[in-house]
Amino acid sequence: MAAASISAIGCNQTLIGTSFYGGWGSSISGEDYQTMLSKTVAPPQQARVSRKAIRAVPMMKNVNEGKGLFAPLVVVTRNLVGKKRFNQLRGKAIALHSQVITEFCKSIGADAKQRQGLIRLAKKNGERLGFLA
């Protein structure tokens, strides 16, 4: 078994009838790699930034936040017990209040639609008084 080595660099003679002239860095059109890169790669440009202000995503917020008779007490309590524990207590209080409203509606014979209206009214009053601050 004989090993043959072929060198592609400097192959200007037509030994085998090839039209390859140049080194490994040559492209199909005959240009070398550095010349081709300088033609195709443009210098990096700065990204265009819109002059318009980017709008923040609207968040569901209480319009009366920080207002109302009980708002300062609610804010101080939330800061003392922590946000997670405060939301748990608030959820329990809201659930208990909804149960009281439901029992009241049962005792006076109000239907479900009236009960829902009373719960919505309680929520609006809570917002105005600052319980949802």
Curated annotation (Swiss-Prot):
InterPro entries recorded: PGR5
Phenotypic consequence of gene deletion: Normal green leaves under continuous-light conditions. Not able to grow under fluctuating-light conditions. The kea3 pgr5 double mutant combines the phenotypes of the single mutants in non-photochemical quenching (NPQ) induction upon overnight dark adaptation. The double mutant missing DLDG1 and PGR5 (dldg1 pgr5) has a pale-green phenotype similar to the dldlg1 simple mutant in continuous light, and a partial compensation of the growth impairment of pgr5 simple mutant under fluctuating-light conditions; higher NPQ than in pgr5 but lower NPQ than in dldg1.
GO cellular component: chloroplast; chloroplast thylakoid; chloroplast thylakoid membrane
Molecular-function GO terms, alphabetical: electron transfer activity
Keywords: Chloroplast, Disulfide bond, Electron transport, Membrane, Plastid, Thylakoid, Transit peptide, Transport
Domain of life of the source: Eukaryota
Keyword Glycoprotein: no
Record's comment on post-translational modification: Disulfide bonds; Cys-11 and Cys-105 are probably involved in the formation of disulfide bridges with 'Cys-300' and 'Cys-303' of PGRL1A. 'Cys-272' and 'Cys-275' of PGRL1A may also be used to form the disulfide bridges, but in this case the cyclic electron flow is lost.
Outcome following mutation: G130S: In pgr5; increased instability of the protein
The keyword Transit peptide appears for this protein: yes
Residue stretch of the organelle transit peptide: 1-60
Membrane topology: Peripheral membrane protein
GO terms of biological process kind: cellular response to light intensity; photoprotection; photosynthetic electron transport in photosystem I; response to high light intensity; response to water deprivation
Annotated compartments: Plastid, Chloroplast thylakoid membrane
Stated induction or repression of this protein's expression: Up-regulated by drought stress.
Sequence similarity: Belongs to the PGR5 family.
Functional description taken from the UniProt entry: Critical for growth under fluctuating-light conditions. Involved in the regulation of the cyclic electron flow (CEF) around Photosystem I. Essential for the reduction of PGRL1A by ferredoxin and for photoprotection. Contributes to maximize photosynthesis efficiency after a long dark adaptation via the regulation of non-photochemical quenching (NPQ); acts independently from DLDG1. Promotes the induction of steady-state proton motive force (pmf) and energy-dependent quenching (qE).
Assembly and interaction partners: Interacts with PGRL1A and PGRL1B.
Protein name (Swiss-Prot/TrEMBL): Protein PROTON GRADIENT REGULATION 5, chloroplastic
UniProt organism field: Arabidopsis thaliana
Gene: PGR5
